[in-house]
Amino acid sequence: MTRGPLYAVSPLDGRYARYTEPLTEHASEAALIRARIEVEVEYLIALADLEATPLTLDESTRSDLRDLHDQFDADDASVVKQLETDGYAGYSATNHDVKAVEYFLRLHLPDEETQGPWVHFGLTSEDV
């Protein structure tokens, strides 16, 4: 049996789906993940710019990190979701959406051991 719009979570993804579909690029879970990646990346770069931290990120790393946001796609969203629900690349399931974004970024750092702890440093989920 196919469940139609009457079984949608809300009228927005049910009977109004044809009208709201263009918004998914900006208002979906994938869009939220992409935005969180941007916040975390720019915050990490700002931390690296502070003399008070030992964190260093060369220009190539900064560019690569910004590309994670700029070139974010469905595969990236799937990896973040997998980190959250099942675990990925040696990480156990986080069961936490923002922690999954943190781990996703750690996977893309050239020196995860020394740079990784600075991802999300001093932040709460509300900040991101």
Model region roles, listed by residue range:
Residues M1-V128:
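A helix-coil-helix interface module used to build multimeric assemblies
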